[in-house]
Protein backbone atom coordinates (compact mmCIF):
# COMPACT_ATOMS: atom_id res chain seq x y z
CA UNK A 1 0.00 0.00 0.00
CA UNK A 2 1.57 3.29 -1.03
CA UNK A 3 2.04 6.14 1.41
CA UNK A 4 0.94 9.60 0.29
CA UNK A 5 2.49 12.72 1.79
CA UNK A 6 0.95 16.14 1.36
CA UNK A 7 3.24 19.08 2.04
CA UNK A 8 1.43 22.10 3.48
CA UNK A 9 2.38 25.40 5.04
CA UNK A 10 2.78 25.72 8.80
CA UNK A 11 -0.45 27.75 8.95
CA UNK A 12 -2.39 25.09 7.02
CA UNK A 13 -0.96 22.36 9.25
CA UNK A 14 -1.92 24.28 12.39
CA UNK A 15 -5.45 24.75 11.05
CA UNK A 16 -5.67 21.03 10.21
CA UNK A 17 -4.52 20.03 13.71
CA UNK A 18 -7.05 22.42 15.29
CA UNK A 19 -9.82 20.90 13.17
CA UNK A 20 -8.85 17.36 14.14
CA UNK A 21 -8.74 18.34 17.81
CA UNK A 22 -12.27 19.75 17.54
CA UNK A 23 -13.45 16.53 15.91
CA UNK A 24 -11.94 14.45 18.72
CA UNK A 25 -13.47 16.71 21.38
CA UNK A 26 -16.88 16.50 19.76
CA UNK A 27 -16.70 12.70 19.73
CA UNK A 28 -15.50 12.54 23.33
CA UNK A 29 -18.37 14.72 24.50
CA UNK A 30 -21.14 12.97 22.58
CA UNK A 31 -24.04 13.21 25.07
CA UNK A 32 -25.56 10.00 23.69
CA UNK A 33 -22.47 7.97 24.61
CA UNK A 34 -23.15 5.49 27.42
CA UNK A 35 -20.34 5.59 29.96
CA UNK A 36 -19.22 3.08 32.57
CA UNK A 37 -18.85 4.18 36.18
CA UNK A 38 -15.04 3.93 36.35
CA UNK A 39 -14.60 6.23 33.34
CA UNK A 40 -17.15 8.76 34.61
CA UNK A 41 -15.52 8.81 38.04
CA UNK A 42 -12.07 9.41 36.56
CA UNK A 43 -13.34 12.29 34.47
CA UNK A 44 -15.47 13.56 37.34
CA UNK A 45 -12.47 13.72 39.64
CA UNK A 46 -10.77 16.09 37.18
CA UNK A 47 -13.89 18.25 36.87
CA UNK A 48 -14.27 18.32 40.67
CA UNK A 49 -10.62 19.29 41.17
CA UNK A 50 -10.96 22.12 38.66
CA UNK A 51 -14.36 23.52 39.61
CA UNK A 52 -15.58 22.28 43.00
CA UNK A 53 -12.69 21.64 45.36
CA UNK A 54 -12.17 25.32 46.22
CA UNK A 55 -15.50 25.43 48.05
CA UNK A 56 -16.43 21.82 48.85
CA UNK A 57 -12.82 20.80 49.72
CA UNK A 58 -10.99 17.66 48.60
CA UNK A 59 -12.69 15.81 51.46
CA UNK A 60 -16.18 16.77 50.23
CA UNK A 61 -16.88 18.15 53.72
CA UNK A 62 -17.42 21.77 52.65
CA UNK A 63 -17.22 24.24 55.49
CA UNK A 64 -19.14 27.17 56.92
CA UNK A 65 -21.94 28.09 54.53
CA UNK A 66 -20.63 25.60 51.96
CA UNK A 67 -22.60 22.39 52.17
CA UNK A 68 -20.87 19.04 52.52
CA UNK A 69 -21.19 16.63 49.62
CA UNK A 70 -19.88 13.69 51.65
CA UNK A 71 -22.97 12.13 53.19
CA UNK A 72 -25.32 14.65 51.57
CA UNK A 73 -28.90 13.45 51.23
CA UNK A 74 -29.16 15.17 47.83
CA UNK A 75 -26.00 13.48 46.57
CA UNK A 76 -27.02 10.07 47.93
CA UNK A 77 -30.59 10.30 46.57
CA UNK A 78 -31.48 7.92 43.74
CA UNK A 79 -33.44 10.81 42.20
CA UNK A 80 -30.67 12.34 40.10
CA UNK A 81 -32.90 15.25 39.16
CA UNK A 82 -32.30 17.05 42.45
CA UNK A 83 -28.53 17.21 42.05
CA UNK A 84 -28.80 17.92 38.32
CA UNK A 85 -31.09 20.89 39.02
CA UNK A 86 -28.64 22.34 41.55
CA UNK A 87 -25.72 22.09 39.14
CA UNK A 88 -27.69 23.57 36.25
CA UNK A 89 -29.45 26.34 38.18
CA UNK A 90 -27.31 27.00 41.24
CA UNK A 91 -28.74 27.22 44.76
CA UNK A 92 -28.86 29.27 47.96
CA UNK A 93 -29.18 32.64 46.22
CA UNK A 94 -25.97 32.14 44.27
CA UNK A 95 -23.85 30.69 47.08
CA UNK A 96 -23.79 27.59 44.89
CA UNK A 97 -23.24 28.86 41.35
CA UNK A 98 -24.78 27.40 38.23
CA UNK A 99 -22.40 25.18 36.28
CA UNK A 100 -24.56 24.97 33.14
CA UNK A 101 -21.61 26.17 31.05
CA UNK A 102 -19.99 22.75 31.56
CA UNK A 103 -20.71 20.02 29.02
CA UNK A 104 -23.29 17.32 29.68
CA UNK A 105 -20.44 14.83 29.97
CA UNK A 106 -18.53 16.91 32.51
CA UNK A 107 -21.66 17.47 34.60
CA UNK A 108 -22.61 13.77 34.48
CA UNK A 109 -19.05 12.88 35.42
CA UNK A 110 -18.83 15.18 38.43
CA UNK A 111 -22.24 14.07 39.70
CA UNK A 112 -21.24 10.42 39.32
CA UNK A 113 -17.96 11.18 41.08
CA UNK A 114 -19.69 12.77 44.08
CA UNK A 115 -22.18 9.89 44.29
CA UNK A 116 -19.29 7.41 44.51
CA UNK A 117 -16.54 9.15 46.45
CA UNK A 118 -15.72 9.59 50.14
CA UNK A 119 -18.36 7.72 52.15
CA UNK A 120 -20.84 8.06 49.26
CA UNK A 121 -20.63 4.63 47.67
CA UNK A 122 -24.02 4.56 45.95
CA UNK A 123 -23.01 2.70 42.79
CA UNK A 124 -25.17 5.23 40.93
CA UNK A 125 -24.02 6.86 37.74
CA UNK A 126 -25.53 9.68 35.76
CA UNK A 127 -25.29 9.55 31.99
CA UNK A 128 -24.78 12.69 29.87
CA UNK A 129 -28.16 12.05 28.22
CA UNK A 130 -29.83 12.79 31.59
CA UNK A 131 -28.22 16.23 31.59
CA UNK A 132 -29.18 16.81 27.99
CA UNK A 133 -32.82 16.00 28.82
CA UNK A 134 -32.76 18.23 31.91
CA UNK A 135 -31.56 21.22 29.87
CA UNK A 136 -34.65 21.11 27.67
Residue ranges of each PLM-predicted region?
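Interdomain boundary/hinge segments at the C-termini of tandem beta-sandwich modules
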Residues: 5-9
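Sequence/structural segment immediately N-terminal to covalent heme-attachment motifs in c-type
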Residues: 38-62, 71-89
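Conserved beta-strand positions that form and line the central face of beta-propeller blades
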Residues: 4, 68, 95-98
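Flexible coil segments in periplasmic/lumen-exposed cytochrome c-class electron-transfer proteins
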Residues: 10, 14-46, 50, 97-136
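Peptidyl-prolyl cis-trans isomerase
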Residues: 65
Amino acid sequence: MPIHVKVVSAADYTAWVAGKNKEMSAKADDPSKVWVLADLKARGEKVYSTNCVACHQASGKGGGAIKALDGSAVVMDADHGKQIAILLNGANNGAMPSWKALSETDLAAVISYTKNNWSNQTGQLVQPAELQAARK
